[in-house]
From Swiss-Prot:
This is Pyrroline-5-carboxylate reductase 2. PANTHER family: PYRROLINE-5-CARBOXYLATE REDUCTASE, PYRROLINE-5-CARBOXYLATE REDUCTASE 2. It is found in: Cytoplasm; Mitochondrion. L-proline binds at residues 164, 237-238. One of its GO terms (molecular function) is pyrroline-5-carboxylate reductase activity. One of its GO terms (biological process) is proline biosynthetic process. Homodecamer; composed of 5 homodimers. Interacts with LTO1. One of its GO terms (cellular component) is mitochondrion. Oxidoreductase that catalyzes the last step in proline biosynthesis, which corresponds to the reduction of pyrroline-5-carboxylate to L-proline using NAD(P)H. At physiologic concentrations, has higher specific activity in the presence of NADH. Involved in cellular response to oxidative stress. In some cell types, such as erythrocytes, its primary function may be the generation of NADP(+). It is an enzyme of class 1 (oxidoreductase). The modification Phosphoserine is found at residue 304. Keywords: Acetylation, Amino-acid biosynthesis, Cytoplasm, Mitochondrion, NADP, Oxidoreductase, Phosphoprotein, Proline biosynthesis. It holds the Pfam family P5CR_dimer.
Length: 320
């Protein structure tokens, strides 16, 4: 099996690092395309031994599982470019926030009648094999296609299938969740420093506290509120700290953050549907170079046989 990434940014880099660390894929079985070969993430992929190219079409030709790892507003343009190269063997996995299965299928069906599309939402902790991933399969994807993706993503953390209408909300929960945690850790460390704890130690202790709390929750059947209560002694320091958090609207802020991320995800889908790109986004993503077909760099591997090693499409069955 070979895996391709259209887009060589943070997500592609994290997944490639996770897959190789887990031992499920060798670096030479991975290819990523980017119009900009000077990106730090491209350099990191190169050091891993991942094949690199400027041509999105070459990425399609050299892969079986194809991850669309670009910004949502770029997806329609990418699909127009690569659609003619997508074959029956390909599993097209969209990782773009808000981009629906139907919108990807509609674009690809202009080139072939039954594209196999899966929508996926993961997060950056896949790099340390502690990711949180959900996916939903499209109209023409086989049951085996979903299981193959689940096997791949389970090697870098937790992965489960969900109904597609949950994915926008999950984007706000676990997709954006690591950013909330990093902000909280930064603030916790600042609090420690304010009270005299050295910065390095404050960061380590804060991170360990959150890691331990998460592991306690995952290893138990207790409600988070019960585990919180277990830390609070009557009249103690922790309950006073929690009262201060409550007075600042701590819970409401987190709830509203998940909601805001979910709403923005749906806005991004609307932009993608309209094939609308703001001037700032156009400049940032170098859209004119995304469509540029250039010769591949020297690390490009020879073409694969075009068949998945772990499944036989002829034996697959469509999802009921």
């Amino acid at each position: 099996m070979s895996v391709g990434f259209i887009g060589a940014g943070q997500l592609a880099c994290a997944l490639a690092r996770g897959f190789t660390a887990a031992g499920v894929l060798s670096a030479h079985k991975i290819i990523a395309s980017s119009p900009d070969m000077d990106l730090p993430t491209v350099s990191a992929l190169r050091r891993m031994g991942v094949n690199l190219t400027r041509s999105n079409k070459d990425t399609v030709r050299h892969s079986d599982v194809l991850f669309l790892a670009v910004k949502p507003h770029i997806i329609p343009f990418i699909l127009d470019e690569i659609g003619a190269d997508v074959q029956e063997r390909h599993i097209v996995v969209s990782c773009a926030a808000g981009v629906t299965i139907s919108s990807v299928e509609k674009k690809l069906m202009a080139f072939q009648p039954a594209p196999k599309v899966i929508r996926c939402m993961t997060n950056t902790p896949v790099v340390v094999r502690e990711g949180a991933t959900v996916y939903a399969t499209g109209t023409h994807a086989l049951v085996e296609d979903g299981k193959l993706l689940e096997q791949l993503m389970s090697s870098v953390g937790f992965c489960t299938e969900v109904e597609e209408d949950l994915i926008d909300a999950i984007t706000g929960l676990s997709g954006s969740g690591p950013a909330y945690a990093f902000m909280a850790l930064d603030a916790l460390a600042d609090g420690g420093v304010k009270m005299g704890v050295p910065r390095r130690l404050a960061v380590r202790l804060g991170a360990q506290a959150l890691l331990g709390a998460a592991k306690m929750l995952l290893d138990s059947e207790d409600h988070p509120g019960q585990l919180k209560d277990n830390v609070c002694s009557p009249g103690g320091a922790t309950i006073h700290a929690l009262h201060f958090l409550e007075s600042g609207g701590f819970r409401s802020l987190l709830i509203n953050a998940v909601e805001a991320s979910c709403i923005r995800t749906r806005e991004l889908q609307s932009m993608a549907d309209q094939e609308k790109v703001s001037p700032a986004a156009l400049k940032k993503t170098l859209l004119d170079r995304v469509k540029l077909e250039s010769p591949t760099v020297s690390t490009l591997a020879p073409p694969s046989s075009g068949k998945l090693l772990t499944r036989n499409p002829a034996q697959g069955s469509k999802k009921e």
